[in-house]
Amino acid sequence: MAFRVSISTFGKSLRVRRVANVSAPLANASPFLRTGWAARPPGTNNGHGFRFTPACFITSDAFLSRLAKGKAETDDTHYHHPASVLPDSAEQLSLLVKDPDQPENSKVLRVAIIGAPNAGKSTLSNQLLGRKVFAVSKKVHTTRARALGVLTEDDTQIILLDTPGLTTPTKVKRHQLEKSLLEDPWNTVKEAGLVVVMVDVSDKWACNKLDFEVLKCLTQHPDVPAVLVLNKVDLLKSKSRLLEITADLTCGVVNGRKLQVRRVIKPPWAERRTDREARTSGSGDEEKPGGDVADGEGSEALSGLSKEQLRALKTQQGWAHFKDVFMVSAVDGEDVETLKRYLVVGAKPGSWQYHSDVLTDQTPEEICTNTVREKLLEYLPKEVPYTMTQAIDLWHDRENGELDIAVKLYVKKESHMKMVIGQAGQMVARIAREAGDDLSTVFLREVKLRLSVKVKN
């Protein structure tokens, strides 16, 4: 097992001569570690404080060797640029059913990305695809139904299954959410060859404990390999906390090996005091996000777990069967690039499911309404965007290549309509402008989007 530290993640911590030590067998370290680029910060002459290439992960030596081999083999090959979505529904459907143009020795991997609502699943999918095709916002339940993205590179096809955040039957009923938000994540994991579990480490109430619904999902499918992705690490002030979070969420075990994390710059008496404080704060954190635990037994039928298993999971903090751990941030694309390389190298021989020009299985109209909804969630307060509906009045592809779209927004109250329109129409104009810009990048053409608002009786 090896631990590699991202420059971007631990940049501030590197001002200290020695910050943290990860105890793990390094006698047979991977060649990837021995030959990879490394630099030693000024003033460190004792072997500690090395700065390795960006992208931080914990993984087995054997896989690191495969990762290095795969990277070396693909550095000089042709890169398949991200595809675009065809703006015509019939053409998009025709492309989806078109025979795959797979090469000899093709490889494929289906990846289910799961996590609590607002963990950053859709953002990660967009970064991996190299193009924004999934709606994202700071509010929960932006993703309402499962959709997939297709990443094709050389002889490998990665199918990303973007899912709604795992939720409970109680919350679905309370907030009048679609049934798909409850069922889609569970069904997706059944089809996956790899599960990516996203955790927002900037959420101080939940970062030390896996979401209860996530634990149930992992427990039901222990045979599906899973990796942990710690997201938004750039927002964490104390970078050394990442080590503690990793230990908590993995139960101190990664790829079947125990992970020992301890401070090395404090005297023993200070270390003992820190341990006591950590245990005290840890017990408090476990109680904070207990809302999902309360109705765990209500989803017994969906999860397929017995009441005894569900009760046991209530006291479980992490998952001891993660194969690897990655740390990513929205500000550093190199971290995501390493995760992408991991997926490509981990793909197995098999037939492609889609033509290499396919980017997503969403229809152009679905992408449009999801993009508009993203902006509504971003700029409108409280429950307003959740109660709105949309209808596409116009979809016209001009001869000059421009795409004209007109969408009617329906609200329930006059007061909501005033919020959507804004002062002198500034709010609705802003939403139309930003949504139109996003659609232009998806369809690779100029998009003129017009929005109108109406109170629905």
Curated annotation (Swiss-Prot):
Membrane topology label: Peripheral membrane protein
Main location (coarse class): mitochondrion
Domain KH type-2 residue range list: 376-457
One Pfam family named in its UniProt record: KH_2
Subcellular location: Mitochondrion matrix; Mitochondrion inner membrane
Family, as annotated: Belongs to the TRAFAC class TrmE-Era-EngA-EngB-Septin-like GTPase superfamily. Era GTPase family.
Described function: Probable GTPase that plays a role in the mitochondrial ribosomal small subunit assembly. Specifically binds the 12S mitochondrial rRNA (12S mt-rRNA) to a 33 nucleotide section delineating the 3' terminal stem-loop region. May act as a chaperone that protects the 12S mt-rRNA on the 28S mitoribosomal subunit during ribosomal small subunit assembly.
Descriptive protein name: GTPase Era, mitochondrial
Organism: Salmo salar
